[in-house]
């Protein structure tokens, strides 16, 4: 299935790229999310007419994400959790807990923007968490997990 990208998609392309994707990926993700349109003659002409508008919208999203990243740069978040004597948590701290703590600290972050490549946090200590605000904007936030 050939599609025209309306937004930057990681590992696929940028705005205006005409790419070939598997049909299921196109129908179930790219098209419903508004990230692409099918590459028909009409859609190609419509895209070329709206290209400047879409690029301006993308630039606005990047500048908004950069502004949020600047707010997050100086932020240090502390989360208190029940822990045993050796520093192991009873339970874990996941993306939702981190997003709620950052939002409570004053910067709105969705749980889908929090990246934990090693999985959930299960011990007390200091961690550096990646917050991906946009495909091009990633900010590191210092997180301190303390025992209650």
From Swiss-Prot:
GO terms for molecular function: rRNA binding; structural constituent of ribosome. One of its GO terms (cellular component) is ribosome. InterPro entries: Ribosomal_bL9 (IPR000244), Ribosomal_bL9/RNase_H1_N (IPR009027), Ribosomal_bL9_bac/chp (IPR020594), Ribosomal_bL9_C (IPR020069), Ribosomal_bL9_C_sf (IPR036791), Ribosomal_bL9_N (IPR020070), Ribosomal_bL9_N_sf (IPR036935). Keywords: Ribonucleoprotein, Ribosomal protein, RNA-binding, rRNA-binding. The keyword Translocase does not apply. Pfam families: Ribosomal_L9_C (PF03948), Ribosomal_L9_N (PF01281). GO terms for biological process: translation. NCBIfam families: L9 (TIGR00158). HAMAP family: Ribosomal_bL9 (MF_00503). Belongs to the bacterial ribosomal protein bL9 family. Binds to the 23S rRNA. This is Large ribosomal subunit protein bL9. It comes from Cellvibrio japonicus (strain Ueda107) (Pseudomonas fluorescens subsp. cellulosa).
């Amino acid at each position: 299935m050939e599609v025209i990208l309306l937004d930057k998609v990681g590992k696929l392309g940028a705005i205006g790229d005409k790419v070939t994707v598997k049909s299921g990926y196109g129908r179930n993700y790219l098209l419903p999310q508004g990230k692409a349109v099918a590459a028909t003659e009409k859609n190609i002409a419509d895209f070329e007419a709206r290209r400047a508008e879409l690029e301006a919208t993308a630039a606005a999203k990047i500048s908004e994400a950069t502004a949020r990243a600047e707010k997050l740069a100086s932020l240090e978040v502390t989360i208190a959790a029940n822990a045993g004597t050796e520093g192991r948590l009873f339970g874990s701290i996941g993306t939702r807990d981190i997003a709620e703590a950052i939002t409570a600290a004053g910067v709105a972050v969705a749980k889908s923007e929090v990246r934990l490549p090693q999985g959930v946090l299960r011990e007390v200590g200091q961690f550096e968490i990646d917050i991906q605000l946009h495909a091009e904007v990633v900010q590191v936030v210092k997180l301190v997990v303390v025992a209650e």
